[in-house]
């Protein structure tokens, strides 16, 4: 069965613009990239993470001070892929705003809260879910033990990131992430995952271009 996200991407509309050299066609996402808008849509995995990181670095090279906007609608995915995006967001110079449309679950929620302070948003009907990392291992007992130790270290590191960006204490984060924890947009704001719930564009301050 085909991945519905891949199927949808094959149906991306084209935008035609008039230039001094005649007409030029862009796919809609390339056109939005010109406006410094990046989409994180669907499962977070290495291929998607590579594209998102490349777009972030490209936009930094174009203008190291102008805001970049990340639109997130993701169920989460591979932790290391998400951490690649997270680290790139923190590494580059431009402030990165985040906006949850639809859902931001698992690694999606971590990327949502990792936006620049006061520039993290969710739409009214967005859903957010946080939880601890999960994984399955097989092999020799000593290898399984090492994998278990590693995922415990990873859990601790993810908790520390949520502490940093939400303002919650470590015990609260650990308790909240112990199981799948679902939040409405307003609950996500109260928890510190987003700064504001917005229903119209005017509610977002003008992009920072200084």
From Swiss-Prot:
CDD domains: S14_ClpP_2 (cd07017). It comes from the Bacteria. Its EC number is 3.4.21.92. GO terms for cellular component: cytoplasm; endopeptidase Clp complex. SUPFAM superfamilies: ClpP/crotonase. One of its GO terms (biological process) is protein quality control for misfolded or incompletely synthesized proteins. InterPro entries: ClpP, ClpP/crotonase-like_dom_sf, ClpP/TepA, ClpP_His_AS, ClpP_Ser_AS. The keyword Metal-binding does not apply. PROSITE patterns: CLP_PROTEASE_HIS, CLP_PROTEASE_SER. The keyword Nucleus does not apply. NCBIfam families: PRK00277.1, PRK12553.1. Belongs to the peptidase S14 family. This is ATP-dependent Clp protease proteolytic subunit 1. The gene is clpP1.
């Amino acid at each position: 069965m085909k991945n519905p996200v891949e199927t949808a991407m094959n149906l991306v509309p084209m935008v035609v613009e008039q230039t001094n050299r005649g007409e030029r066609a862009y796919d809609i996402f390339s056109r939005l990239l010109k406006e410094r808008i990046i989409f994180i849509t669907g499962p977070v995995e290495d291929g998607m993470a590579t594209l998102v990181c490349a777009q972030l670095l490209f936009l930094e090279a174009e203008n190291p001070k102008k805001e970049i906007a990340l639109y997130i609608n993701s169920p989460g995915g591979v932790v290391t892929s998400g951490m690649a995006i997270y680290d790139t967001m923190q590494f580059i110079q431009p402030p990165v705003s985040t906006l949850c449309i639809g859902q931001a679950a698992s690694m999606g929620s971590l990327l949502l809260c990792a936006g620049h302070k006061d520039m993290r948003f969710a739409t009214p009907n967005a859903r957010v879910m946080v939880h601890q990392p999960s994984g399955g291992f097989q092999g020799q007992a000593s290898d399984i033990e090492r994998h278990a130790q590693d995922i415990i270290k990873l859990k601790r590191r993810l908790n520390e990131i949520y502490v940093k960006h939400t303002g919650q204490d470590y015990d609260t984060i650990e308790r909240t992430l112990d199981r799948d924890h679902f939040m409405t947009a307003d609950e996500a704001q109260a928890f510190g995952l987003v700064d504001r719930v917005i229903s119209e564009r005017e509610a977002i301050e003008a992009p920072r271009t200084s």
